[in-house]
């Protein structure tokens, strides 16, 4: 698949440069919500994940997040799969809901929910709003997909594929968030 990426990236860029309002078919993207989220956290993490180096399953933080997800909002239908790529935690009152452990990475959470809304809209679902649920903190954040954010999502999709197509992983971030990352041992050993 990586061999066809330069053509795909060029086609996406051409569409943007011509400022055409043509939706990108979701089925051609095959970018997961996790990839979209990782782009806003760490490009190295995104690259490693895209190259099947997945260390998060051993992370205590991921385990705790999964427990919170499983036991919060028990009345809601959980994990709605779209094309085997996108997993939405639940839909309620016409809004996409995403359950997160904490708001420490809220920007990435916001963009992940916006991406889910974008994907649903590409499939013909009339939805513009989302909610990020932080049950441990007993709070929510409302999210709305605007035309400007939709354009940013398209730009981000291009950038994600560029990061993933690179021959080598990006440099180590060297940030305080690295200490809680499932990839910390890989990056710093």
Walk through the language-model features, giving the residues of each:
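Conserved catalytic cores of phosphodiester-cleaving nucleases, focusing on short active-site segments
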Residues: 42, 88-103, 116-118
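Charged, glycine-rich intrinsically disordered N-terminal tails and low-complexity linkers that flank
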Residues: 1-81
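Metal-dependent nuclease catalytic regions and adjoining charged, substrate-binding loops involved
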Residues: 70-83, 122-189
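Short, charged, amphipathic alpha-helix that recurs within catalytic cores of restriction-modification
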Residues: 109-121
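Structural motif
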Residues: 31-38, 108, 169-176
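Generic detection of long, well-ordered alpha-helical segments
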Residues: 33, 110, 146-150
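Short amphipathic alpha-helical segments and their helix-coil junctions
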Residues: 21-29, 92-100, 159-168
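Active-site metal-binding core of divalent-cation-utilizing nuclease and nuclease-like domains
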Residues: 58-93, 104-111, 138-145
């Amino acid at each position: 698949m990586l061999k066809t990426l330069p053509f795909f990236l060029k086609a996406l860029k051409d569409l943007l440069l011509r400022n055409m309002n043509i939706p990108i078919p979701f089925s051609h993207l095959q970018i997961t919500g996790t990839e979209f989220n990782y782009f806003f956290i760490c490009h190295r993490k995104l690259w490693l994940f895209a190259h099947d180096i997945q260390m998060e399953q051993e992370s205590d933080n991921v385990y705790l997040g999964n427990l919170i997800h499983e036991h919060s909002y028990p009345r809601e239908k959980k994990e709605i799969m779209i094309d085997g790529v996108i997993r939405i935690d639940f839909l309620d009152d016409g809004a996409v809901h995403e359950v997160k452990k904490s708001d420490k990475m809220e920007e990435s959470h916001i963009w992940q929910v916006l991406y889910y809304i974008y994907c649903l809209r590409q499939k013909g679902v009339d939805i513009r709003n989302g909610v990020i649920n932080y049950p441990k903190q007993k709070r929510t954040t409302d999210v709305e997909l605007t035309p400007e954010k939709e354009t940013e999502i398209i730009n981000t999709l291009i950038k994600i594929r560029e990061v993933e197509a690179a021959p080598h992983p990006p440099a180590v971030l060297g940030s305080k968030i690295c200490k809680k990352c499932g990839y910390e041992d890989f990056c710093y050993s």
